[in-house]
Structure formats: structure tokens, C-alpha cells
From Swiss-Prot:
This is Class I hydrophobin rodE. InterPro entries: Hydrophobin (IPR001338). Aerial growth, conidiation, and dispersal of filamentous fungi in the environment rely upon a capability of their secreting small amphipathic proteins called hydrophobins (HPBs) with low sequence identity. Class I can self-assemble into an outermost layer of rodlet bundles on aerial cell surfaces, conferring cellular hydrophobicity that supports fungal growth, development and dispersal; whereas Class II form highly ordered films at water-air interfaces through intermolecular interactions but contribute nothing to the rodlet structure. Disulfide bonds join 43-126, 59-120, 60-95, 127-140. GO terms for molecular function: structural constituent of cell wall. Induction: No expression is detected in sporulating cultures, nor in vegetative cultures or during infection.
Length: 145
């Protein structure tokens, strides 16, 4: 009879049931798999929960309140002959289509998580107003990740 590897040697737990010891690498692999599954599920659950259509979902470097626009946003609006007092919703600056990479960056660096340190220079938003080639986008609502 061949000896059993040490990591599979039987032990008794507190209920006197036979239990095999699992190698530490199995536990780490299981933890990583669970983490990846939860992150994926959170991505899909958040995106699917939004009522925003794919064409309106954007990733902007800045989202600004229309009542508190910085000089750059005000200058762009003037060039486009748009009165800032008529705006509803946030104003997105330097926006592009919301990609998986942008969404993952937002999800992994949001406050309260310890998955990745750092920050994203991005804000996920649903913008139903005019989009001026991503330079400035109107009628935005931030998507909570």
C-alpha cells in the first residue's frame, strides 16, 4: 500500500467526521475564482440594471453640474452657442463610448473596495442630450458602479 500524500491525510473535525486536508494552493485558487465570479457578476448586474441604452452610455473624464461649470465647459458651450442656463443634467467632458475596460476600472477602484489601489480618470454616465464628438456631451446622469 502506498502512503497517502500529507495534504490528503485524514483528520477528524469537531463533529468527529473524517475530513481531508486541502492544500493551501487549492484554497487560494478557490478564493480567486470566487472573486473573479463576483466581479463579473457585479459588472453584469450593474450594467443590466441600467435603463441607459448602449448608444447613450459613455465614459467621461469629467462630469460637471450645469450650475457649477468650470471655465473650460463654459467656453465650449459658448463656442457651440449653447446657453448654460438652459441645460438639464450634468455636462460630460472628454467622453467616449463606455467600454468594458472603463467600467472595470471604475468598479475595481471605487471607494470601499480593496481590489486595486489608485483611481480612474473616468466617470460612467448615461447622456441623452447632444454629443459633440465626445468633446462635450449634454444631458448626462452618472451611472453608479
Amino acid at each position: 500500500m502506498h502512503p497517502r500524500p500529507e495534504h490528503l491525510s485524514p483528520t477528524l473535525n469537531h463533529n468527529h467526521r473524517l475530513k481531508l486536508k486541502q492544500p493551501a494552493t487549492t484554497s487560494r485558487m478557490l478564493a480567486r475564482t470566487i472573486l473573479a465570479t463576483l466581479v463579473s457578476a457585479a459588472c453584469f448586474a450593474t450594467v443590466n440594471a441600467q435603463t441607459c441604452s448602449a448608444t447613450n452610455a459613455v465614459c467621461c473624464q469629467q462630469l460637471q453640474d450645469p450650475d457649477n461649470l468650470n471655465a473650460d465647459a463654459l467656453n465650449l458651450l459658448r463656442l457651440l452657442n449653447i446657453n448654460p442656463n438652459t441645460l438639464t443634467g450634468a455636462v460630460g467632458l472628454t467622453c467616449k463610448r463606455l467600454t468594458e475596460a472603463c467600467f472595470a476600472c471604475l468598479l475595481l477602484t471605487r471607494p470601499g473596495t480593496s481590489l486595486v489601489s489608485g483611481s480612474c480618470n473616468a466617470n460612467a454616465a448615461c447622456c441623452t442630450g447632444n454629443n459633440y464628438n465626445g468633446l462635450i456631451v449634454l444631458g448626462c446622469t452618472q451611472i453608479q458602479v
